[in-house]
């Protein structure tokens, strides 16, 4: 039986050809190599029909135009030459679309990304909807690649080189109003008239290119170009620390096209695409993409989730306010916040107002939509309005007795089916549920701060949590736009447990005389978004260190922090950015004017000696402890798989994505090399570096955590 076509041609009575994109059996349109013959057959029909006046590409999917190319095509390439051929085939197809003698218009609704935008760029004009779902971008850099079907050449000529570089180097996605302002699209219309607007444009002569702003024209010239690429190159190097080769190749390819012409530019683009596809960085980033996609499809348990119609939140603090925001504004669920103090409720409501008002100011959201979303959030100082809530998220202080009291109150004031989810970061869920009448409906739901930005949540069932409670909580997390991993109810869960020894070691190096800025710079160079000391300042020194005694009590000496250091810092009223006193100096209202270390910190913690470690040595000490603890978590079934372990570290603490996560990084080094490094460090610095049994066994057997395929585990 012949497979249904992803591209179909229909000719209207007014002689406008409509090419409908609808990949069979898929929610999202993605471009695959086998579609090229379908498109070429349509192009042939269009060329043969001399009556046609214009062509419109439109998607049949409800919320996407084309979300990009199928990444599996790249994974199937065994050599750089094969990947280069793939890029050249894409370039050729786009060139054939662009060469059609009649106007070709892209009618865009929903995601128009990667290869989808490259197809739209090959058209002569573009119309998009004003819907919030409509975004346009070239996110290939986030996979360690560059646009390979002409995007690096067409985009700079359409919107200007500096604007195009910003889009390509960051993967930035534009909304409709931004796109039309920059000249990326010709018109923005309501969804209801998208097709007709595109048809009207197709009936006219080919849309003429909008003149570029004077600034962009100057930057495209030889002198402006030299200055621009030097400046952008420096900025990019500082941001990536040289860890992402794709950014360097993007600059090279775009500059080649501008200096030597499009023919040389396309050639450079295809070669760079092929070479980047084979880099370990791209392979790791693509593996993270696949693992993330799998996690988002994982229901958490085999049981069907219960209905979710409304949510309650206990506590209107920073976490409670953030959770209310993602529940109402991302999940679209009515939220009722309970706080003992009206000020807490006001704080939570203001939090959502500030987030939404910011979107209105940036023209990402209409004021009417802001008001509609805010109307989903209400507050109370008692349990009025909680009787029929399906799930309650507790976000009160980290106090076991208080949380147990919250369980009792929810069971007394809510329905018998109501799930109680605790946002604890350190307390065992089994202890929180110890006196519950319905312990099967108690679970942990650990968000990370700031809630609206951090993509990960840990879902923590205790021994008696039901499968349906797990599935329902996973369902909620996904609705909130989060990536959930299910972890075992052990001290520190997963993310905080692997983070603690990493931070402890940084503090220990401080006491040995290493400078704060040297330690942080070393870990940023390694690939973390911020260093461990700055991270403590950002999350709050009191908050970040509160779990340390819990972990030391559970796992022993390897989690012990340097004696009296943390207490000395806290006793000096240093909580980090939030109170303007931490390891770093802060300006008014806790804002940093320029990041500078507070020199008073060194005598305060009793730092001894002069630091002599190189940046790689500093990073090695912190990272090896994190890797070792991640393997212990896998061994103890704290995490269900190495997939979850890698996703948890990358999305939860910013483990360098280009390394693929702790387990992929161990595989890239080899278990034998990791064991050898740790044994050397154990000899130098103590038994906390002793490699765990599983690593030693894997080293002896030559085993790895991941198979060579993109997503399968051993």
Curated annotation (Swiss-Prot):
Q: Which E.C. number(s) belong to this protein?
A: 4.2.1.17, 5.1.2.3, 1.1.1.35
Site annotation Important for catalytic activity: residues: 118, 140
Q: Where is this region: 3-hydroxyacyl-CoA dehydrogenase?
A: 306-714
Which cystines does this chain contain?
Answer: none
Q: Which GO terms describe its cellular component?
A: cytoplasm
- One Pfam short name: ECH_1
Task: Report the record's Gene Ontology biological process terms.
Answer: fatty acid beta-oxidation
Q: In which pathway does it act?
A: Lipid metabolism; fatty acid beta-oxidation
Q: Which reaction does it catalyse?
A: a (3S)-3-hydroxyacyl-CoA = a (2E)-enoyl-CoA + H2O; a 4-saturated-(3S)-3-hydroxyacyl-CoA = a (3E)-enoyl-CoA + H2O; a (3S)-3-hydroxyacyl-CoA + NAD(+) = a 3-oxoacyl-CoA + NADH + H(+); (3S)-3-hydroxybutanoyl-CoA = (3R)-3-hydroxybutanoyl-CoA
- Sorted alphabetically, which keywords does the UniProt record give? Cytoplasm, Fatty acid metabolism, Isomerase, Lipid degradation, Lipid metabolism, Lyase, Multifunctional enzyme, NAD, Oxidoreductase
Molecular function terms from GO: 3-hydroxybutyryl-CoA epimerase activity; enoyl-CoA hydratase activity; long-chain-3-hydroxyacyl-CoA dehydrogenase activity; NAD+ binding
HAMAP family (alphabetical): FadJ
Function noted in UniProt: Catalyzes the formation of a hydroxyacyl-CoA by addition of water on enoyl-CoA. Also exhibits 3-hydroxyacyl-CoA epimerase and 3-hydroxyacyl-CoA dehydrogenase activities.
Task: Please identify the protein, giving its name as recorded.
Answer: Fatty acid oxidation complex subunit alpha
Q: Which organism is it from?
A: Escherichia coli O127:H6 (strain E2348/69 / EPEC)
């Amino acid at each position: 039986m012949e497979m249904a076509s992803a591209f179909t041609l229909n000719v209207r009575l007014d002689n406008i050809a409509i090419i409908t994109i609808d990949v069979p059996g898929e929610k999202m349109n993605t471009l695959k190599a086998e579609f090229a013959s379908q498109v070429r057959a349509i192009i042939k029909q269009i060329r043969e029909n001399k009556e046609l006046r214009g062509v419109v590409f439109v998607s049949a999917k409800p919320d996407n135009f084309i979300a990009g190319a199928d990444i599996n095509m790249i994974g199937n390439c065994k050599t750089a030459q094969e990947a280069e051929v793939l890029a050249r085939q894409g370039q050729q197809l786009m060139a054939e679309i662009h060469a059609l003698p009649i106007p070709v218009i892209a009618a865009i609704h929903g995601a128009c990304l990667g290869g989808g935008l490259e197809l739209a760029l090959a058209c002569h004009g573009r119309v998009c909807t004003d819907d919030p779902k409509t975004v346009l971008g070239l996110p290939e850099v986030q996979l360690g690649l560059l646009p390979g079907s002409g995007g690096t050449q067409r985009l700079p000529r359409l919107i200007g080189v500096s604007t195009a570089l910003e889009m390509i180097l960051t993967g930035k996605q534009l909304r409709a109003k931004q796109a039309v302002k920059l000249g990326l699209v010709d018109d923005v219309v309501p969804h209801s008239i998208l097709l007709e607007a595109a048809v009207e444009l197709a009936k006219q002569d080919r849309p003429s290119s909008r003149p570029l702003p004077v600034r962009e024209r100057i930057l495209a010239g030889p002198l402006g170009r030299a200055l621009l690429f030097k400046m952008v190159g420096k900025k990019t190097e500082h941001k990536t620390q040289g860890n992402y080769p794709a950014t360097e190749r993007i600059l090279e390819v775009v500059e080649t096209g501008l200096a030597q012409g499009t023919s040389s530019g396309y050639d450079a683009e295809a070669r760079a695409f092929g070479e980047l596809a084979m880099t370990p960085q791209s392979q790791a980033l693509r593996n993270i993409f696949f693992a993330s996609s799998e996690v988002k499809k994982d229901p958490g348990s085999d049981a069907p989730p219960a209905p979710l119609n409304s949510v309650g939140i206990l506590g209107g603090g920073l976490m409670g306010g953030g959770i209310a925001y993602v529940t109402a504004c991302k999940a679209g669920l009515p939220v009722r916040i309970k706080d003992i103090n009206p000020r807490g409720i006001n704080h939570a409501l203001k939090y959502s107002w500030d987030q939404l008002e910011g979107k209105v100011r940036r023209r990402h959201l209409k004021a009417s939509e802001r008001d509609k979303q805010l109307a989903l959030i209400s507050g109370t100082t008692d349990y009025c309005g909680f009787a029929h809530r399906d799930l309650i998220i507790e976000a009160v202080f980290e106090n076991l007795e208080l949380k147990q009291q919250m369980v009792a109150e929810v069971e007394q004031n809510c329905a018998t089916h109501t799930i109680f989810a605790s946002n604890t970061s350190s307390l065992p869920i089994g202890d929180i549920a110890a006196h519950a009448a319905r312990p099967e409906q108690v679970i942990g739901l650990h968000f990370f701060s700031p809630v609206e930005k951090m993509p990960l949540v840990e879902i923590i069932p205790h021994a008696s949590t039901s499968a349906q409670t797990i599935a329902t909580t996973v369902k909620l997390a996904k609705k909130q736009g989060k990536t959930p991993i299910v972890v075992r109810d052990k001290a520190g869960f997963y993310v905080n447990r692997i983070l603690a020894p990493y931070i402890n070691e940084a503090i220990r190096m401080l006491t040995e005389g290493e400078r704060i800025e040297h330690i942080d710079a070393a870990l940023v160079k390694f690939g973390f978004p911020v260093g461990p000391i700055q991270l403590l300042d950002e999350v709050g020194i009191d908050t970040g260190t509160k779990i340390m005694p819990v972990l030391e009590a559970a796992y022993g000496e390897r989690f012990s922090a340097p004696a009296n250091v943390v207490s000395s810092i806290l006793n000096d009223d240093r909580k980090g950015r939030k109170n303007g006193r931490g390891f770093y100096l802060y300006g008014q209202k806790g804002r940093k004017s320029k990041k500078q270390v507070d020199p008073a910190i060194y005598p305060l913690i009793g730092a001894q000696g002069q630091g002599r470690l190189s940046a790689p040595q500093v990073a090695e000490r912190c990272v090896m402890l994190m890797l070792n603890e991640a393997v212990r978590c896998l061994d103890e079934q704290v995490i269900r798989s190495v997939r979850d372990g890698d996703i948890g570290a990358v999305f939860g603490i910013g483990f360098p994505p280009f390394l693929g996560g702790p387990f992929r990084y161990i595989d890239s080094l080899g278990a034998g090399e990791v064991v050898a490094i740790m044994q050397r460090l154990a000899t130098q610095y103590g038994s906390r570096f002793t490699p765990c049994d599983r690593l030693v066994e894997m080293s002896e057997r030559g085993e790895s955590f991941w198979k060579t395929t993109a997503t399968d585990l051993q």
